């Protein structure tokens, strides 16, 4: 009986299998759209906000209270007419040329000594160069003095007490270069901006003006060519010593390049000529041979006289004046208004109306 029950159970219908669970469908991942790389926002270049008071050029540095540095530089040639090499010409803002004995000498004015390359050959002072430097409240650097230059410097209190009078020699901020083109001891005294700055720190040199807004007497405009001026593509300056400096206007460079002794006037540091946007030729009474050493005397203060201004290939007669030795030079156009110089470098020559002068065409 029990066996039949088991058999009956085994002979029943086969149960249906449980339905399989459905496999979940794989999730579809959306492909992200490529993200555009953002363009970097360009950093605006700051505009120059200051003006170099010696050139009128825009600058990022505020020089309004900075004292310029004036350096006496030899200007001569060898017997064959080869120019004695000069360094620093291209970095000078203003270049003076005046006679000394039977030759001429230069004074380079630098607004900034940062990065100032070799300046050479540094030579001795003369009183009228000291006077011109004082019109800018400049620190005056030289190698030696004439007797009258020494007397004038002492009288004007340009001495080590105020550290305005920087004597450049091998014991201070100078060094000599004996290889060509420097040619030994006499024609090789050299300094640099870094050496000058080091000496200023050592001496405690006053490197800023005593008063705010120092007035150099210089006015600038972008277009200074004389409106009614005469053509002056070339000019010839003759000093009382019969030394001749010539200029030719270079329209591509926008200024006057110079020749001396029929050679291009270049900076030995760069090998290139220098273009001056402005050329000022100022007449002044000149005495030659005032002592046994044939020194000269030139009126540079407490005086006024005529002159010429050259810019853009044109010439204009002007007048200049200056009061005391600590006052700036003033320049006036032919209509009596303040003369507007072109933005850039300036060359200034003092000549005699009776022993030389200037001609142009």
How should these model regions be labeled?
Residues 1-3:
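Sec-dependent N-terminal signal peptides
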Residues 12-47:
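Ser/Thr-rich, Proline-interspersed low-complexity disordered segments
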Residues 46-92, 96, 101-361:
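A surface/extracellular/periplasmic glyco- and lipid-processing/surface-interacting theme
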Residues 7-10:
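C-terminal motif of bacterial Sec signal peptides marking the signal peptidase cleavage site
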């Amino acid at each position: 009986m029990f066996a039949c029950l088991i058999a009956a159970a085994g002979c029943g219908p086969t149960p249906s299998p449980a339905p399989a669970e459905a496999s979940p469908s794989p999730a579809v991942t959306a492909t992200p759209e490529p993200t555009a790389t953002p363009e970097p926002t360009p950093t605006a270049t700051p505009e120059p906000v200051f003006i170099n008071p010696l050139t009128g050029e825009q600058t990022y540095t505020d020089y309004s209270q900075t004292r310029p540095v004036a350096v006496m530089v030899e200007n001569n040639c060898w017997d064959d007419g080869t120019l004695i090499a000069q360094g620093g010409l291209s970095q000078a803002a203003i270049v003076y040329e005046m006679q000394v004995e039977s030759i001429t000498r230069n004074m380079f004015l630098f607004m900034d000594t940062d990065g100032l390359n070799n300046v050479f050959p540094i030579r001795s002072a003369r009183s009228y160069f000291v006077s011109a430097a004082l019109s800018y409240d400049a620190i005056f650097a030289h190698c030696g003095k004439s007797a009258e230059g020494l007397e004038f410097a002492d009288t004007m209190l340009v001495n080590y007490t105020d550290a305005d009078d920087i004597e450049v020699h091998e014991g201070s901020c100078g060094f000599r270069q004996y290889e060509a083109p420097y040619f030994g001891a006499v024609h090789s005294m050299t300094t640099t901006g870094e050496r000058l700055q080091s000496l200023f720190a050592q001496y405690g040199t006053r490197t800023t003006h005593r008063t705010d807004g120092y007035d150099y007497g210089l006015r600038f405009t972008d277009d200074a060519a004389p409106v009614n001026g005469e053509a002056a593509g070339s000019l010839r300056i003759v000093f009382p010593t019969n030394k001749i400096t010539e200029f030719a206007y270079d329209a591509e460079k926008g200024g006057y390049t110079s020749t001396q002794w029929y050679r291009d006037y270049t900076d030995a540091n760069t090998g290139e000529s220098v273009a001056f946007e402005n050329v000022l030729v100022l007449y002044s009474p000149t005495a030659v041979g005032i002592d046994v050493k044939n020194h000269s005397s030139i009126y540079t203060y407490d005086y006024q006289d005529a002159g010429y201004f050259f810019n853009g290939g044109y010439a204009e007669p002007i007048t200049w004046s200056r009061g005391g030795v600590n006052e700036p030079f003033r320049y006036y156009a032919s209509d009596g208004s303040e003369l507007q110089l072109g933005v850039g470098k300036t060359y200034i020559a003092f000549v005699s109306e009776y022993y030389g002068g200037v001609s142009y065409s």
